[in-house]
A protein has these predicted regions:
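N-terminal helix-turn-helix DNA-binding core of bacterial DNA-binding proteins
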Residues: 2-43
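HhH-family (HhH-GPD) DNA N-glycosylase catalytic core used in base-excision repair
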Residues: 5-6, 86-93
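Basic, amphipathic "hinge/linker" alpha-helix immediately C-terminal to the N-terminal HTH DNA-binding motif
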Residues: 12, 63-85
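Residues within the DNA-recognition helix of helix-turn-helix
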Residues: 47
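Glycine-centered, phosphate/nucleic-acid-interacting loop/turn motifs that mediate DNA/RNA or nucleotide
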Residues: 55
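Short beta-strand "wing" residues that participate in macromolecule-binding interfaces
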Residues: 59
């Protein structure tokens, strides 16, 4: 499997990169992610579980039994790739 194929196994699913892009702004709670992205509840929950299992994000305990999602170092390392894809979108779509 090529390196690109391995990356797409983790990030190629619908909403995955958009979740990472949103979390590059800082930790966010589930409801905030859902509101910002407009993703369906089941889809968002599935993608968050997949990205957590892949080590891209983690659940951050907050006060009063609430949690937020935050990027790991592995997730933060995607900043340049996401910026490049965003620039490509501006230039070519």
């Amino acid at each position: 499997v090529s390196d690109l194929a391995a990356a797409l196994d983790v990030l190629g699913a619908r909403w995955a990169l958009l979740i990472v892009e949103q979390l590059l702004e800082g930790p966010q709670r589930y409801g905030d992610l859902q509101r910002e992205l407009g993703a369906g509840t089941n889809m968002l929950a599935t993608r968050l579980r997949e990205l957590e299992a892949a080590g891209v994000l983690y659940r951050l305990p907050l006060h009063h039994n609430t949690r937020a999602y935050a990027l790991t170092e592995r997730g933060l390392a995607l900043r340049d790739a996401i910026d490049a894809l965003s620039r490509w979108g501006v230039d070519h779509t």
